[in-house]
Amino acid sequence: MPEYEGNCLCKAIHLKAIIEEPKLSCCHCETCRIWCSSPFMAFSCTQKPSVSENENVGKYASSSFAERIFCKNCGTTLYFAYTNGKNPYFINAWLFKGIENITFDAQVCIDDKPDCYDFANKTSMFTVDEVMKSIVK
């Protein structure tokens, strides 16, 4: 399986992740939109990404079931992780260079999406309720 490498904007954090398939998904939930100033666009990853651990790695528990990992220095969004360790990790898709044949596959929390934008791509769409039911406890 292909392993990709990327950095945050200030290059203080180096990240490696195995991306099984370059299928892009995005989350329209309010928390992701505030976190990223847009929908969070990510690749799903079954293995925890390898991150150069240092004082710049920040973790924020955004809910009782998830945390968000970011660079404390430049603010780059790195990834979203369920705290149960069973669900996939969602890695910022734009950290990596050289990923080919990316497809826009899914939109989650579609019922939280504001009316002011739409993506033209045909994707699978999941509501907040469907996402919450899919989380392995």
From Swiss-Prot:
Keywords: Cytoplasm, Lyase, Metal-binding, Nucleus, Zinc. One of its GO terms (biological process) is formaldehyde catabolic process. The keyword Nucleus applies. Binds 2 Zn(2+) ions per subunit. Zn(2+) 1 binds at residues 8, 10, 71, 74. Pfam families: GFA (PF04828). Residues 4-118 form the CENP-V/GFA domain. The keyword Lyase applies. Its cofactor is Zn(2+). SUPFAM superfamilies: Mss4-like (SSF51316). GO terms for molecular function: metal ion binding; S-(hydroxymethyl)glutathione synthase activity. PANTHER family: CENP-V_GFA DOMAIN-CONTAINING PROTEIN-RELATED, GFA DOMAIN-CONTAINING PROTEIN. Belongs to the Gfa family. This is Uncharacterized lyase C29B12.13. It comes from Schizosaccharomyces pombe (strain 972 / ATCC 24843) (Fission yeast).
